[in-house]
Amino acid sequence: MAYKLILAAFAATALAAPVEERQSCSNGVWAQCGGQNWSGTPCCTSGNKCVKLNDFYSQCQPGSAEPSSTAAGPSSTTATKTTATGGSSTTAGGSVTSAPPAASDNPYAGVDLWANNYYRSEVMNLAVPKLSGAKATAAAKVADVPSFQWMDTYDHISLMEDTLADIRKANKAGGKYAGQFVVYDLPNRDCAAAASNGEYSLDKDGANKYKAYIAKIKGILQNYSDTKVILVIEPDSLANLVTNLNVDKCAKAESAYKELTVYAIKELNLPNVSMYLDAGHGGWLGWPANIGPAAKLYAQIYKDAGKPSRVRGLVTNVSNYNGWKLSTKPDYTESNPNYDEQRYINAFAPLLAQEGWSNVKFIVDQGRSGKQPTGQKAQGDWCNAKGTGFGLRPSTNTGDALADAFVWVKPGGESDGTSDTSAARYDYHCGLDDALKPAPEAGTWFQAYFEQLLDNANPSFL
């Protein structure tokens, strides 16, 4: 999958060249005006006020009140880097009741996560045989880490059915497992890039084909109503509508993306299901020029769908590399204040609440975020980035009330996109200096990348 991050010049402009005098303050509406490590001036242009959203982020919002020096000023507190203890591959234990959880409940609490056989077979049959000794032993441990299973084509829906059958069998034997899956087949998919273009096109009845795809998923979920399922909904799609409508393919897909996302979450609003809409990552939508419009869009989708009770919140950092809580700001994040995922979700949640989506919760992909900083030259370099490692294991022990769990959405070792410039799905990001090459097509096994993740894993598998 791909994140074509066109972080437009206005994003940088919103943070650039702060002036000293209040009367000439350049921090306009939705710009940052304070927070931890903020080096600019704590002021806003006329007609706006500086509002503290959290310790990390204060923002200029419409209003005439004068900014508070305590709300807007930079904090002297320094965040510490989170390190995990042990190598547990499941969430905290507990019992699963026969009744579905309330919408306010964390779906990750009280269950174990299922390590699906598809990823296990990739690791055991493709990765391990090419390794030896301690490294082969370490690689085999990766197969035990629960990751999401991607339904990136209609035909791959059957893999979910197979996995749910395995889970039901294990649960009848006394287990308490939940399955994790990604819904990822919108028509005109991956509109701002090429690496993960999908099977449906809007000009070839793609909308109706997508509805049939959703109907197939719904039927299976209803057949397994006794099994808890967690869904990630359409990586990249809505985020592209925030930043990439200047791309013709995205502009043409805008209304369909919105309508079909609403359709999907309404149809899949089942008692045994919990859903998280994909919301990019801090290096994409976390920029001050993007985070306000993003909150409006996501809240509107949620409201247009009738505020489905099984939509728990948002997932961030899918297939990306951002750390959760960093003590040092990586150079490649430039002036972005929300350069790690904890800062991002804590800046995002209050804005969503203002737009009508309150009590939103998050899950955060940390599957490839173990090495910080990475080898990226820009935070938007999404394709097979060098210098990355397996990260924090799936867990509900996040230390933040907004974060339900750390998860592995992207199966580590599957390629982000091909580096073959002659390929139909070649994207230039996969040919950048900071992308590992040669790389196969998106979704296919990339042994060299798996070994990089294993070598740099934090916590280590060795």
UniProtKB/Swiss-Prot annotation:
Catalytic activity: Endohydrolysis of (1->4)-beta-D-glucosidic linkages in cellulose, lichenin and cereal beta-D-glucans
Boundaries of every CBM1 domain copy: 25-61
Superkingdom of the source species: Eukaryota
UniProt entry keywords in alphabetical sequence: Carbohydrate metabolism, Cellulose degradation, Disulfide bond, Glycoprotein, Glycosidase, Hydrolase, Polysaccharide degradation, Signal
EC number, UniProt record: 3.2.1.4
Stretches the record annotates as Linker: 66-99
Signal peptide: 1-16
GO biological process, one term: cellulose catabolic process
Broad class of enzyme this protein falls into: hydrolase
Region Disordered: start-end pairs: 64-102
Residues with glycosylation annotation: 37, 223, 272, 317
InterPro entries on file: Beta_cellobiohydrolase, Beta_cellobiohydrolase_sf, CBD_sf, Cellulose-bd_dom_fun, Glyco_hydro_6_CS
Disulfide partners: 33-50, 44-60, 191-250, 383-430
Record-level Gene Ontology MF annotations: cellulase activity; cellulose binding
Matching SUPFAM superfamilies: Cellulose-binding domain, Glycosyl hydrolases family 6, cellulases
Xref: PANTHER family: 1,4-BETA-D-GLUCAN CELLOBIOHYDROLASE C-RELATED, PTHR34876
The name this protein goes by in its record: Putative endoglucanase type B
